[in-house]
């Protein structure tokens, strides 16, 4: 078993102890096979953020006091002696009237969802609306075949996928408009084979849906478009409410997890550009998987850089191996550790953090809170822009 804990010296002045310094334990996991990090010194913005967290955030005093390795994660076993999934990773069986309705409509229109393609464990909960009543679905456009081959992804791949259906934006918009959804996520495969990486097709889909359902909240979960600013601008200005692009894993594991054409710097730049191009009030969002071999220290550094890029929402979920052909799971992170990352993310200044073993980038519970947040922002904006009543005579 790997050694799980070492200390991250986060200094914190507690209100009830004059001039006392508390060394906080971190989720740092140092593996015997790892070598000392060779990362350059973080930029001043990150240094300032670390200082602010250490000095000003009282909730960090309780951050991750994990005393044994099992508090952070559990092993997955070996090929010869595999271990069963922990109890918190048990999946529920999809069902419900809305679930059945959405699935039937998808088949009729020959549309694809990443929920099905990626075998998402939350599909039934999201499609049915679950406890919140906010039914959501994640529609995948530009076909079901990706030009890239990330080591975690179950979507089929090809260097030359079929051309996109030119009528797809209209079909998707009409289908989604008829489902009675409150919040929809539109995503796509990577289309490196297309001159504009599929960005025009993506933007057209969002625009057509907004015409039919102007009050529906739309999240666009986009590929990196090879970092092309023109492609990012096109989608950012299409009328979406949330611009999402996933960095997938910590900076140090990018080449081990993602396709060689993707990288951390490029993804971070896409998120920065989206913030610049999109209308005021548009949220930016990203997600990473845990259990890929990352250390807690790497997760924290990645969070710092994502927040410094102005990202509003971040989600964390457990990586699950889709098949034996894919990258193996390194470890199962405990719900308690996920909760610590959520607390730290909120202390860093993210507006919302969804973190849990079964959380995925497009997750019903998270979308419910994001919807509430956007509604509140718009109500406040409307109130501040309304003319003040004239004083009584």
Curated annotation (Swiss-Prot):
Pathway(s) per entry: Protein modification; protein lipoylation via endogenous pathway; protein N(6)-(lipoyl)lysine from octanoyl-[acyl-carrier-protein]: step 2/2
Entry keywords, A to Z: 4Fe-4S, Iron, Iron-sulfur, Metal-binding, Mitochondrion, S-adenosyl-L-methionine, Transferase
Cofactor(s), names only, from the UniProt record: [4Fe-4S] cluster
Binding site for [4Fe-4S] cluster 2: 146, 150, 153
Keyword Transferase: yes
Enzyme class: transferase
GO molecular function: 4 iron, 4 sulfur cluster binding; lipoate synthase activity; metal ion binding
Cofactor note: Binds 2 [4Fe-4S] clusters per subunit. One cluster is coordinated with 3 cysteines and an exchangeable S-adenosyl-L-methionine.
GO cellular component entries: mitochondrion
Residue numbers binding [4Fe-4S] cluster 1: 115, 120, 126, 362
Domain of life of the organism encoding this protein: Eukaryota
Record has Phosphoprotein as a keyword: no
Compartments it resides in: Mitochondrion
UniProt domain Radical SAM core: residue ranges: 131-351
Enzyme Commission number, as recorded: 2.8.1.8
Entries under InterPro entries matching the protein: Aldolase_TIM, Elp3/MiaA/NifB-like_rSAM, LIAS_N, Lipoyl_synth, Lipoyl_synth_mt, rSAM
Pfam families on file: LIAS_N (PF16881), Radical_SAM (PF04055)
Identification of the protein by name: Lipoyl synthase, mitochondrial
Gene field: LIP1
């Amino acid at each position: 078993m790997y050694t799980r804990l070492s200390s991250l010296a986060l200094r914190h002045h507690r209100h009830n102890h004059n001039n006392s310094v508390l060394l906080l334990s971190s989720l740092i996991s140092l593996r015997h096979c790892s070598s000392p990090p060779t990362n350059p010194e973080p930029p001043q913005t990150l240094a300032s953020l670390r200082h602010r967290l250490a000095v000003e955030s009282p909730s960090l005093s309780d951050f991750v006091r994990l005393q044994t390795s099992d508090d952070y994660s559990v092993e997955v076993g070996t090929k010869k002696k595999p271990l069963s999934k922990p109890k918190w990773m048990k999946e529920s069986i999809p069902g419900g009237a809305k679930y059945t309705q959405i699935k039937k409509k998808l088949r009729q229109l020959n549309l694809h969802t990443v929920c099905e393609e990626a075998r998402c464990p939350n599909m039934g909960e999201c499609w049915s609306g679950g406890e919140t009543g906010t039914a959501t679905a994640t529609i995948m456009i530009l076909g079901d075949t990706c030009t890239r081959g990330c080591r975690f992804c179950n979507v089929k791949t090809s260097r030359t996928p079929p051309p996109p259906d030119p009528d797809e934006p209209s079909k998707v918009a009409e289908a989604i408009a008829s489902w009675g959804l409150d919040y929809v996520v539109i995503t796509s495969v990577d289309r490196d084979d297309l001159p504009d990486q599929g960005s025009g097709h993506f933007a057209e889909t969002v625009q057509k849906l907004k015409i039919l359902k102007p009050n529906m909240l739309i999240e666009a979960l986009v590929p990196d478009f090879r970092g092309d600013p023109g492609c990012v601008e096109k989608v950012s200005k299409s009328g979406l409410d949330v611009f999402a692009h996933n960095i997938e894993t910590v900076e140090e594991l990018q080449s081990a997890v993602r396709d060689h054409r993707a990288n951390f710097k490029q993804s971070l730049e896409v998120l920065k550009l989206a913030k610049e191009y999109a209308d005021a009030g548009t949220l930016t969002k990203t997600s990473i998987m845990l259990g890929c071999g990352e250390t807690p220290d790497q997760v924290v550094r990645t969070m710092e850089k994502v927040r410094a890029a102005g990202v509003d929402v971040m989600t964390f979920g457990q990586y699950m191996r889709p098949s034996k052909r894919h990258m193996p799971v390194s470890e199962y992170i405990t719900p308690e550790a996920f909760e610590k990352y959520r607390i730290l993310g909120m202390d860093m200044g993210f507006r919302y953090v969804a973190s849990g073993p079964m959380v995925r980038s497009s997750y019903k519970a998270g979308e419910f809170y994001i919807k509430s947040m956007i509604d509140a922002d718009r109500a406040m904006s409307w109130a501040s822009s309304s003319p003040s009543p004239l004083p009584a005579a």
